[in-house]
A protein has these predicted regions:
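Short beta-strand element of Class I
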Residues: 29-31
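Helix N-cap at the beta1-alpha1 junction of Rossmann-like dinucleotide-binding domains, i.e.
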Residues: 36-39
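Rossmann-fold cofactor-recognition segment
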Residues: 49-64
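Conserved Rossmann-fold cofactor-binding substructure of NAD(P)-dependent oxidoreductases
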Residues: 61-77, 84, 88
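Rossmann-fold NAD(P)-binding glycine/threonine-rich loop
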Residues: 107-134
Length: 287
């Protein structure tokens, strides 16, 4: 492949960057870019001497299309790997269009001022990317991502037809903390506190947050409580798996997590509505 520009330097980005460096024959060179360049420099220092991949760093505001275009033109990557926040998907896609650079992300776009995520905003770019002769690969994490690959493989190689898909996302880890999120806390809490939905009979069925609970005995992990959530791969699978009748997505949560989340909700800390605090406007969830 040659060179990749990786935007973001949080937990998910760190894992992806480590994996890129383990495959230096593919990722010969990477540039790590983030609003806080010191995080990029720290990760670069940690990785140097452990990989043949050449690593550079850069500062960029991923909300600013002009800054992104300038960075892409300077780095000249073969592909941009977007591991920033979902709010920034569209600005990064715009920059890739302007520079005719291939694009990959792991989570679909959602507006910062609305706790709602769906593919419609990004799917609207399909013709633009086709006309530019470049590829945009959306939702290339585990879920979404691997879940879609598993479903497509099963349809092609194992089944004549698939009518029902249930995706069960289980975190069996326990590090002893009473409350911790699986990924970016702000995005995770927005996702969990939003209304759920699933696809059935050709239309969407909406549920209240955490309304539908099931118990499942996960091999190697044990019995866990899981709750129905909306998730983006439901949209893409409903579109691309012919004959599908129902698709649902469940995620496991421990009681301690849910208790702390409820406390945060009760005191207004999960709200995305701006409020005034000590003369400044803040968003409680980000605070």
């Amino acid at each position: 492949m040659g060179k990749a520009l990786i935007i973001g330097c949080g937990g998910v980005a760190s894992v992806a960057i480590h994996k890129c460096c383990q495959n230096s024959e593919v990722f010969e060179e990477i540039c790590i870019a983030s609003r806080t360049v010191s995080k990029c420099d720290a990760l670069k220092e940690k990785l140097q001497g452990t990989t043949k991949t050449k690593i550079t760093t850069a500062q960029v505001n991923a909300d600013n299309v002009d800054e992104l275009i300038a960075l892409i033109n300077d780095v000249k990557p073969d592909v941009v790997l977007n591991l920033a926040l979902p709010y920034q998907d569209l600005t990064i896609m715009d920059a890739c269009l302007a520079t005719k650079t291939h694009y990959i992300d792991t989570a679909n776009y959602e507006p910062e001022d609305t706790a709602k995520f769906e593919y419609s905003w990004q799917w609207a770019y399909r013709e633009k990317f086709e006309e530019a002769g470049i590829t945009a690969l959306l939702g290339s994490g585990f879920d979404p991502g691997v879940t879609g690959v598993f479903s497509a493989y099963a349809l092609k190689h194992e089944f004549d037809e698939i009518n029902y898909i249930d995706i069960l996302d289980c975190n069996g880890g326990d590090h002893g903390y009473p409350f911790a999120t699986n990924f970016n806390p702000e995005i995770n809490i927005r996702e969990v506190s939003a209304k759920g939905s699933y696809w059935e009979g050709g239309h969407w069925v909406e549920t209240e947050p955490m309304e539908i609970k099931r118990e499942y005995n996960f091999e190697g992990v044990g019995e866990k409580d899981m709750y129905l959530l909306h998730h983006e791969e439901i949209e893409s699978l409903a579109l691309n798996i012919p004959g599908i009748k129902r698709i649902r997505f469940f995620m496991t949560f421990g009681q301690s997590y849910l208790t702390h989340l409820k406390c945060l909700e009760n005191v207004g800390m999960t709200s995305i509505e701006p409020i005034m605090y000590e003369g400044k406007e803040i968003i409680p969830l980000q605070f």
